[in-house]
Design a protein with these regions (language model features):
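Glycine-centered loop/turn positions within well-structured domains
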Residues: 10, 21, 37, 93
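Short beta-strand segments that buttress and anchor functional surface loops
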Residues: 12-16
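C-terminal catalytic lobe of FAD-dependent flavoproteins
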Residues: 43-95, 100-320
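Core beta-strand elements of the Rossmann-like FAD/NAD(P) dinucleotide-binding domain
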Residues: 18-27
């Protein structure tokens, strides 16, 4: 909530459940997404930041709409590309996406009825069965924090990332604009390279050949990895084991611990979500709420009834407050 620049360091004021505290750092990396301009405003009080162009992208989820494990790309009538992807074990189809200029509250981003109609109509041009808003079982939306290159059409705004490192008046602040998940690793290495002069002891880049947490599967052979898991945990139902293996990779053994039966995984909240997995997510992936677990860390909300979701929320509240 506060930034103060000095010749060789920054003082940042952080606010959390336990109040405020001040920390010091030699540099600030401003990777705040849609809030990057607000952070720059803290770093440079009194200046007006207008570096971002916010573009909303929304998706709809419908029951499985085509056979096979294929993803499809469609050319929409307005020239945009749409896609339909098998989703959540192939039980659903994910259809996206939209490009809508956005100036509303970034904390409350939701799909509009016009976007739902747009996606249904666009996909229906290619499916034998038309998709209607009544078929939509879930939606999600996000705001793309794109660098404002002053393109007239929201779909034409650059998706490339832009880095801006400012050392005016003291310690550096590196701001990240735009970018996509497909370039996140390269972006991160580029950011560190920009800060190299400020950290002479920085090591050389190493992430290109490094696995993500849980991704160090021998030979990158998932099916062979799954067979090994089945041998180590013969008591587990294969559908559940496959989901956990896909979600957690080599970390699945840490999640399962010493369990020798499904009963030892603890309470079953529905949809194959057990207490052991919830506890793992709370301890290792910062999950605090039912929404964290059912939507942000997974998409299991699609498989739980409303009463099951409510039971999970109640259980979590007790755990967090204990």
């Amino acid at each position: 909530v506060g930034l103060a620049r000095h010749a060789d360091h920054w003082e940042a004021t952080l606010r959390g459940p336990e109040g405020e505290k001040t920390v010091m750092a030699r540099a600030v990396v401003n990777a705040a997404g849609g809030w990057v301009d607000e952070i720059l405003g803290l770093a440079e009080p009194g200046t007006r930041q207008q570096n971002l162009r916010l573009v909303k992208g929304s998706h709809i989820i419908v029951p499985r709409w085509h056979e096979g494990d294929y993803a499809y790309f469609f050319q929409n009538g307005d020239g945009r590309i749409m896609f339909a992807i098998p989703y959540e074990r192939g039980e659903f189809t994910l259809i996206g996406t939209t490009d809508v200029p956005y100036e509303a509250d970034k904390d409350k981003v939701e799909i509009s009825q016009d976007e739902i109609a747009y996606l249904c109509a666009g996909a229906s041009e290619y499916y034998k069965r038309s998709i209607t808003p009544a078929d939509v079982v879930a939606t999600y939306s996000g705001v793309r924090p794109l660098y404002d290159d002053h393109a007239a059409n929201a779909s034409k705004v650059t998706r490339d990332y832009v880095l801006n490192c400012d050392r005016t008046g003291g310690a550096p602040v590196l701001s990240v604009f735009g970018g996509k998940i497909t370039t996140y690793r390269e972006l991160a290495e580029h950011a560190l390279k920009e800060l190299g002069p400020d950290f002479p002891g920085m090591t050389k880049p190493w992430t290109k050949s490094a696995s993500l947490p849980g991704g160090d599967i021998p030979g990158a052979d998932f099916e062979d990895f799954l067979r090994g898991l089945s041998l180590r945990h013969p008591w587990m139902e294969q559908r559940l084991l496959r989901r956990l293996a896909r979600a957690y990779g080599t970390r699945v053994d840490a999640l399962l611990g010493t369990a020798k039966s499904t009963v030892e995984l603890g309470r079953d909240f529905g949809g194959g979500l057990h207490e052991a997995e919830v506890t793992y997510l709370m301890r290792h992936e910062f999950a605090q709420t039912a929404e964290d677990i059912l939507w942000r860390r997974s998409k299991l909300r699609l498989h739980l009834s409303e009463s099951e979701q409510a039971s999970l929320a109640t259980w979590l509240e007790r755990q967090v407050s204990a």
